[in-house]
A protein has these predicted regions:
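Cytoplasmic juxtamembrane interface segments
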Residues: 3-6, 67-93, 161, 166
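Membrane-helix interfacial "entry" motifs
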Residues: 3-15, 42, 46-50, 54, ...
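Alpha-helical transmembrane segments and their helix-start/interface "positive-inside/aromatic belt" motifs
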Residues: 7-20, 83-97, 173-177
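Hydrophobic alpha-helical membrane-embedded or membrane-associated segments
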Residues: 14, 18-25, 57-65, 94, ...
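Membrane-interfacial interhelical loops
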Residues: 28-57, 90-147, 191-195
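Hydrophobic cores of alpha-helical transmembrane segments in multi-pass inner/ER membrane proteins
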Residues: 60-73, 143-159
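Cytosolic-side transmembrane helix boundary signature
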Residues: 79-80, 148-178
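Internal/C-terminal transmembrane anchor helices
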Residues: 169-194
């Protein structure tokens, strides 16, 4: 067991750290959303309760986002030197951009729309001018700048967590089985949260 843990530690630590970082990232977004859109001062416990209440959904999203990294960790077990960060870079850039857009748009437009982003937003895809009819050009420009900065910050964080490369595991079969167990647990976790 000692040599298995020793070989797999870097991979497991990365995945657990990544999952925790995404949870923390999502949790920190809630107080910012509440602070920006609050009509009256909120107590500290209100922020904590919101973060706790959203933890279940945040964990589900984090599970989906860490599924691809887990698959790559599985592949890395059989590679001599696996350039994980290089391979993950496009994925994390895309994820960071999407997360930044959702967070900033949701936070900024809640005061105009009166509801958080959901499937309703797709009703405006054919007529985006209606969606932003009550928003000034300056507001949109500021939003684009904030989205860019937020996406850059998210990208830096996700790439910083990701190891530059992973070395080959000495006992590939055991390592593969170990990661498959984690993957199975993740699948059950996601399915349980969704249903």
């Amino acid at each position: 067991l000692r040599w298995v843990v020793g070989d797999m530690w870097k991979r497991v630590a990365y995945w657990v750290g990544l999952f925790a970082a995404l949870l923390l990232l999502f949790a920190c977004q809630k107080p910012l959303f509440m602070w920006y859109n609050a009509l009256k001062p909120l107590a500290f416990k209100d922020y904590i309760e919101a973060m706790w209440h959203g933890m279940s959904l945040d964990a589900t999203v984090a599970g989906y986002l860490t599924a691809i990294p887990l698959l790559l960790l599985l592949v890395s077990v059989w590679a001599k030197r696996f350039p994980l960060r290089k391979i993950m870079r496009p994925y994390w850039i895309l994820v960071a951009i999407v997360l930044a857009i959702v967070f900033v748009v949701d936070t900024a437009l809640y005061a105009f729309w009166g509801f958080k982003l959901d499937a309703t937003v797709f009703n405006y895809l054919d007529s985006p001018s209606e969606a932003f009819a009550s928003v000034s050009v300056g507001f949109i420009v500021a939003g684009v700048i904030i989205i860019s900065l937020t996406a850059t910050l998210f990208t830096y964080l996700l790439l910083w967590i990701t190891p530059k490369r992973l070395d080959k595991v000495r006992h590939q079969i055991v390592g593969t089985f170990f990661l498959l167990l984690i993957g199975g647990g993740l699948f059950v976790f996601i399915r349980g949260r969704v249903t």
